[in-house]
Amino acid sequence: MAMRVLLVDDSVMVRDIVRNHVECMGGSVVAEAENTMQALDLFRTVNPDLVILDVAVSQTGGIGALALFRIMRSEVPEMPVLVISGLALPDLRRSFIREGALDYLFKPFTPRTFEQLRNLLVERFPELAHPMIQVRNAAPIARLATAG
């Protein structure tokens, strides 16, 4: 069964890039949200295996995303949440990691970022390590990720 992902990011371009990468690995983005309210509604209805959450989905500099993260973790404590951000805020990163985020990856994405993402997901979802499920031609996706 494919890994079911809820993708939360206010940028359509970033959602496209991340969705393409998840699908190349054999996963499925089952829902996308561009703000915290949409994300919480979808989280409660689509039952994802993983949430990929951008810190900047609210105008509060990450505080709204952290509050959303805490609500999700209180409702489903074992839910893996991967945080992505263009904000280099070490204290916020530490807060997410301390509270149980799978990891906190920085944008813009590079080929190395996608390799980190793949390794994290394979660790959490071993079925993604199957030899037939490979990151197919990630270079064009990585080029798109740094365009802008």
Task: Enumerate the predicted regions with their spans.
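Two-component signal transduction core modules
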Residues: 51, 81, 104-105
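C-terminal output helix
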Residues: 91, 109-121
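CheY-like receiver
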Residues: 116-119, 123-148
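Active-site beta3 strand of CheY-like receiver
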Residues: 46-57
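Short amphipathic alpha-helix used as the core "switch/output" element in two-component signaling
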Residues: 41, 63-77
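Alpha4 helix (beta4-alpha4-beta5 surface) of REC/receiver domains from two-component response regulators
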Residues: 63, 67, 88-105
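Two-component/phosphorelay signaling modules centered on CheY-like receiver
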Residues: 12-31
